[in-house]
């Protein structure tokens, strides 16, 4: 029996991929093993997310320091959890939630709580001499995800680009994850050349995608289609498109303002807009296609497009089982984006994935725009057989680290590994 009793918990302030501070937590157990986790941070955040605790001291990191969260881990949380069993994840997470005592984890900070939650799981996995995906997922963990690669950025992730935040490719026709990654990388390099040939800038955004100045939102889809074809792949067969327009950012006074196009659309008109795009492009997944509080619009979107397209709730659902339960009962959306730091513990994250699966929904495991070398989400997506991962372009080490971990997992699984491909989706095409 591995000795997974917690001996010590320590936290420190480190930097994320955008040069902002974040929290890293180490959990030591009696076997001598240690688990370490770095917590990510988002750029466009849902109003209903768990609260990331920042210091607010303008003399350090422009107020973005996390020394308060670090202090909470090193004192309050460490004192409460030392002597507890790191392998009892549900109990650990329940204690963390009780210790905080707020609805949004705002007292101790969702960043402090998540760091401890994940580091406990990693320490227990190490004590059992198991990779994290196997420790969390058991013998059934064997599905490698289709990568949802953000290769063109706009909105809050770039400047002078499109109204919409992310344009992505999904190599659904690849025979393995390794090949899917190669296809994605080749299309990414092809896109760079397409943009360069048009005299555009090949600067990259937070998540590694290019952020050229484009005349219209649709121009982004057009150059991606060209890049796929130039790389030698067939859009609509081998490679599908996905989008995250982050429409909450465009919603004001009951309308969606597309500044690039000089238009303001009602919810019904926005649904028409997406229906038209889906009819003309091989769009398989649309995330936050409407604003986070536009419930009536979401129901309309699901009724119109739900059998053809994966409609993912991110800001809309914020990995929150209460919002997810309502969306399931009201038939708004048909997929949930899973971001660990939106809800703040591993247990609650796994609960959200389970609830989605029971309803016949899909779950897409996701990074945040502020990332690090931490690869927990790569193990999580295999552990849950979720079948889809969203972790940026095949560029920048903070993104590539996750892809490289998935390559290792696929190799380790050998003949048991199964690449999700089109099977990742629960729609008719």
Swiss-Prot record:
Pfam families given in the database record: Enolase_C, Enolase_N
Active-site annotation: 207, 339
Cofactor(s) essential for the protein: Mg(2+)
One GO CC term, this protein: extracellular region
Pathway listed: Carbohydrate degradation; glycolysis; pyruvate from D-glyceraldehyde 3-phosphate: step 4/5
Coiled coil: none
UniProt KW keywords: Cytoplasm, Glycolysis, Lyase, Magnesium, Metal-binding, Secreted
SUPFAM superfamilies hit by this protein: Enolase C-terminal domain-like, Enolase N-terminal domain-like
GO MF annotations, alphabetized: magnesium ion binding; phosphopyruvate hydratase activity
Residues where Mg(2+) binds: 244, 287, 314
Cofactor remark from the record: Binds a second Mg(2+) ion via substrate during catalysis.
NCBIfam families, per the entry: eno (TIGR01060)
Family membership noted in the UniProt record: Belongs to the enolase family.
Protein name (Swiss-Prot/TrEMBL): Enolase
Species: Roseiflexus sp. (strain RS-1)
Gene name for this UniProt entry: eno
